[in-house]
Curated annotation (Swiss-Prot):
Gene: ribH
Catalysed transformations (reactions): (2S)-2-hydroxy-3-oxobutyl phosphate + 5-amino-6-(D-ribitylamino)uracil = 6,7-dimethyl-8-(1-D-ribityl)lumazine + phosphate + 2 H2O + H(+)
EC number assigned by the record: 2.5.1.78
Species in which this protein is naturally found: Geobacillus thermodenitrificans (strain NG80-2)
InterPro entries: LS, LS/RS, LS/RS_sf
Function summary: Catalyzes the formation of 6,7-dimethyl-8-ribityllumazine by condensation of 5-amino-6-(D-ribitylamino)uracil with 3,4-dihydroxy-2-butanone 4-phosphate. This is the penultimate step in the biosynthesis of riboflavin.
Pathway, per record: Cofactor biosynthesis; riboflavin biosynthesis; riboflavin from 2-hydroxy-3-oxobutyl phosphate and 5-amino-6-(D-ribitylamino)uracil: step 1/2
Family named by the database record: Belongs to the DMRL synthase family.
Protein name: 6,7-dimethyl-8-ribityllumazine synthase
GO cellular component terms, A-Z: cytosol; riboflavin synthase complex
Amino acid sequence: MNVIEGNLVGTGLKIGIVVSRFNEFITSKLLSGAIDGLTRHGVSDNDITVTWVPGAFEIPLVAKKMAESKQFDAIITLGAVIRGATSHFDYVCSEAAKGVSHAALTSGVPVIFGVLTTDTIEQAIERAGTKAGNKGWEAAVSAIEMANVLRGLA
């Protein structure tokens, strides 16, 4: 029996990060967590490319372009969508998630969904480096593992 598993060795991996400027007080913390997670696992600063976009809705297009460029072993998407009084939250969350998934499936490159979708600002803060850890860091570790899984399948 063959078992293919990813590992958490980031040495030599090239990682793209797409991060939303909207709710930057949260997304900047997610970005710091992601970069910390990548570098602690051996990814060189020179092998990390960060691209800022206006909001979560714009993330999928840039993630897809980066993935299709074949310059990256994985793409991490980071954003923070916080529920408001209208249904706008539902549309943005749904389309961001669908778009990120589509980018991965059409490009064959892992595109990791690190977009927070929370009901409150407090929940977002908790997931950006306090009580609930840093979801940017978790997305970075997932990106490394998935890049290595795909290398194992090649």
